[in-house]
Amino acid sequence: VWDKESNVLPFFVGSYLGAKKVLNVGAGWYAHKDVTANRKSATDTSLVLNTQKNFGLDVFLDMPMNKAKGTALNFYSVYYINDYGKNYVRNLGILNQHAAAEGISANPGTSWAGGGNLQPTLGTGNIWYTQVGYVLPKLKNGTSFMPYVTFTQKKFDRIGKSSGQFDLGMN
């Protein structure tokens, strides 16, 4: 028997830490006209307006493994197909303190996105993101910890080849 998941906010709960048994499968799409713009060519400065089109398919599982110990499995995976216009890529660098954050034109020899932790984060192409976590046995005071690993695979049209990234964390 599966528990019902609250649908109040789409971004509120990432794990129930074994308190619920939840399986959700979702799909969504979004389209909006004239969201991005690009030049027709390097020599033609007139702009082409692009319609943003996004599609996503995801699955979420939060499954108690041993209720007495408080252990649980947490799994989330999503696949996005995004179209922001021809060759659109957006680089982000959260709390990037690198002096060369303005890009490779000013700092040849750095990564495609520039210095520091800048990386292509979204753009026209596909993104697959997966997170797997395991809730460890509860401590005597009732505290729970969930170490997790994530993997992100991105393939943006402008870059041409795909890239992958692993991350580790603790809830």
Set out the residue ranges of the language-model regions.
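Detector for outer-membrane/organellar transmembrane beta-barrel domains
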Residues: 2-3, 7-159
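Active-site pocket scaffolds in enzymes
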Residues: 167
